[in-house]
Design a protein with these regions (language model features):
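An acidic site on a long C-lobe helix of protein kinase domains
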Residues: 49-52, 65-68, 129, 141-147, ...
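A short, structured surface patch at a secondary-structure boundary
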Residues: 125-183, 223-226
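Membrane-penetrating hydrophobic segments
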Residues: 1-9
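Cytosolic-biased juxtamembrane loops and peripheral soluble domains of multi-pass membrane proteins
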Residues: 30-48, 89-92, 116-136, 162-172, ...
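Feature marks short, surface-exposed loop/turn motifs that line or immediately flank catalytic pockets
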Residues: 114-117, 155
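A hydrophobic, helix-centered structural microdomain
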Residues: 8-115, 222-270
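Cytosol-/stroma-facing membrane-proximal "stalk/adaptor" domains immediately downstream
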Residues: 175-241
């Protein structure tokens, strides 16, 4: 029993150290960006002083505790994927107050699709590369466990708007870019209100609502509901069922429900 308590003590110390480093880093960022124009101002003590340290405390602790599971998934992934078990992709992060542009970071997940190719060397369609192992990974959300590293690095938060593809950035209205004024999240308000079953407009509305109302009680509720939804496997839609955001947005442009951003017109000449 004393060995178990000692291990718990070590985990808490390491998690606390990570939390302190995060707090100091946030204060240094405030000094560095003093005078810069922010799209989003932190509301209250929680968002400004507590949220980021808590992210690091729980993410570091969780990473240590589940390390045996990660090692197992890495081993199985190497076998099932016939190589690299990880999938990384550029995603837009929080807007840099000095440049006014989203910081691009590398999101890391467990690979859920194989790299199988046809006779011409082209990747097979997603539905053919998504095997039963990958489907189970996605359904259980185990593929997202490596994202704890992104949280510790400061790319993301435990709770926040989910980071979409970089290619979608040109399709946001100026108001919708506000979703990137905070760190993206491992889970978010949209994920517990329909997960991938919600359409793109609903997801955007949930994200914007979250950005304007960041509170500890709401974050705790979102985490609880996320865990609950993962275990009951609710609101899960297979990849591709909702289509891509760019196609969805072009449809809205065509019917006039959403104006075409001036930046997109200047960039593409549309």
């Amino acid at each position: 029993m004393k060995y178990v308590l000692k291990i718990i003590e070590i985990i808490i110390v390491l998690a606390a150290f990570s939390s302190v480093l995060a707090f100091v880093s946030e204060r240094l960022d405030e000094i560095k960006n003093r005078g810069a124009k922010f799209l989003h101002k932190s509301h209250g003590i929680y968002e400004r002083f507590i949220k980021r340290p808590l992210d690091c405390f729980f993410s570091t602790g969780a990473l240590i505790i589940i390390s045996p599971i990660l090692i197992l998934l890495i081993t199985v992934g190497v076998i099932k994927m016939k190589g690299n078990p990880f999938f990384t992709q550029d995603r837009p992060g929080r807007i840099d107050p000095k440049t006014g542009r989203e910081r691009i970071f590398r999101l890391i997940k467990f690979r859920s699709m194989t790299n199988e190719k046809d006779a011409d060397g082209n990747l097979l369609p997603d539905e053919q590369r998504l095997k039963s192992y990958g489907k189970r990974l996605r359904a259980s959300s185990l593929d997202e466990l490596p994202e704890l590293l992104n949280i510790i690095k400061g790319d993301t938060s435990i709770v926040g708007p989910r980071p979409w593809a970089v290619s979608y950035l040109d399709y946001f209205t100026p108001e919708e870019h506000q979703r990137h004024s905070v760190r993206p999240g491992l889970t978010g308000l949209a994920q517990v209100n329909g997960r991938t079953a919600a359409n793109w407009t609903e997801r955007l509305n949930y994200d914007m609502s979250y950005v304007d109302n960041i509170r500890f009680a709401d974050d705790a509720k979102i985490v609880f509901l996320t865990v609950k939804k993962v275990f009951v496997k609710s609101d899960i839609v297979e990849a591709g069922c909702q289509g891509n955001f760019d196609d969805y947005r072009r449809t809205q442009w065509a019917d006039g429900s959403v104006p075409i951003p001036e930046k997109f017109v200047q960039k593409t000449g549309v």
